[in-house]
Design a protein with these regions (language model features):
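Arg/Lys-rich amphipathic alpha helix in sigma70-family domain 2
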Residues: 50, 60-81, 157, 161
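A short, charge-rich alpha-helical start-of-domain segment used by transcription regulators
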Residues: 1-19, 29-32
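Sigma70-family region 2
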Residues: 2, 37-55, 73-75
Length: 196
């Protein structure tokens, strides 16, 4: 992997790395810092890395480790995720989000233990196979399956509890929201403007 190949790889993977890191650390801003740190570490390690069989996995593992480093530093400092910090989190949708992961806000991900969070993000948000996750995290396939099962169950609980506390919309309001979303997705901005 030469520097030009690395630059192309980093550019292509950057959005996925950011999605993963932001959800791991609970902040879009800190996620960006983690991605930058990971890319710097990868660039530094590149000359000594030798032949890299799976460049995407290699870079994701470096980003994963950088996110874990930030979480450890945060824990040592005793920094807790405040409600203010969670309110500032940007939750970007992914083209491969699973149903539960898509409805879970970033604040719900923050409440998962680190291993469960990693497995759910890698599988449901980034689309990695169980074997790839086991390889990336250096754990057994059984451990991945268990963490994924527990993480999804916990996310379901968190999302359901959030839904219970949210006010219910009237059917007319739901219909307006659906119409708005349909027109937006169809890029029919004239019809969208008429709704406003």
């Amino acid at each position: 992997l030469n520097h030009d190949d690395f630059a192309r790889l980093a550019a292509n993977l950057r959005p996925r790395l950011h999605r993963y890191c932001a959800r791991m650390v609970g902040s879009a801003f800190e996620g960006e810092d983690v991605v930058q740190d990971a890319l710097a570490h990868a660039m530094e390690a590149l000359p000594m890395a030798g032949k890299i069989e799976n460049p995407e996995g290699w870079l994701l593992r470096i980003a994963h480790n950088a996110a874990l480093d930030l979480l450890r530093r945060r824990k040592r400092r005793g920094t807790a995720d405040s409600e203010d910090a969670l309110a500032n989190i940007a939750d970007q949708a992914s083209e491969t989000d699973a149903r539960v992961a898509a409805t879970a806000s970033l604040s719900a991900f923050v409440h998962l233990p680190t291993l469960q969070r990693s497995c759910v993000l890698l599988s449901d948000v980034l689309g990695y196979s169980l074997a790839e996750i086991a390889d990336l995290l250096d754990i057994s396939l059984a451990a991945v399956k268990a963490a994924l099962h527990r993480g999804r169950a916990k996310l379901r609980e968190l999302v359901e509890s959030l839904e219970e506390t949210m006010p219910r919309l009237l059917e007319a309001d739901r219909a307006r929201l659906r119409a708005y979303a349909d027109r937006f997705n169809a890029r029919d901005f004239d019809a969208l403007r008429d709704l406003l």
